[in-house]
Amino acid sequence: MIPEHSAHCHACKDRVRELLAATYGHCHVNHSFSWPARPEDYDHTALGAALRRISGGLGDLRGHRDFIKSALTPPCDFYVPHPPFILEFDECQHFSQARLTALSLYPSDVKLGFPLDRWRQLCRDIDARDDEPIDRDERRAWYDTLRDLVPALHGFEPTVRLYAEEFVWCSLDSATRRDQERFRAILIERLK
């Protein structure tokens, strides 16, 4: 039986967790890594210039330049250790003008676990605005950027992003092989 479904369906995110565990054996929820959150901490890495460019672009967007509040990257939605990758479950608030700005500044050769052009279009179509606090959109876009780009420095597969409303995730049954395979096919497509 499908639970009551809505745009902010908690059962959908729970089902994604169950499917990750069924597919990969284990997944961590709200997992934290000790990865720095400030662009200058990456100056001597392959991402240094890109992260400086993205943080600058976010600061220029609305003039909110002090949006990086945490010394470390906040927890990710899901972390699968084998093979190592992060999965983020993006609800509508992730598709903002700030996120579009960040995505537009990604290096052209970066490998992503989601369709970049589609995510950009979702940002244009949804145009979410969350001004509480005033720089919330910039913060969210920055931390999403770190979760997209930094894992590669640590040997991870690309971060997979699922749009919460692209599918009724709670309609899947994590106990059935058919739905496990259906979910796995989505992940494999994103990780190509």
Model regions: which residues?
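Nucleic-acid endo/exonuclease domains
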Residues: 1-192
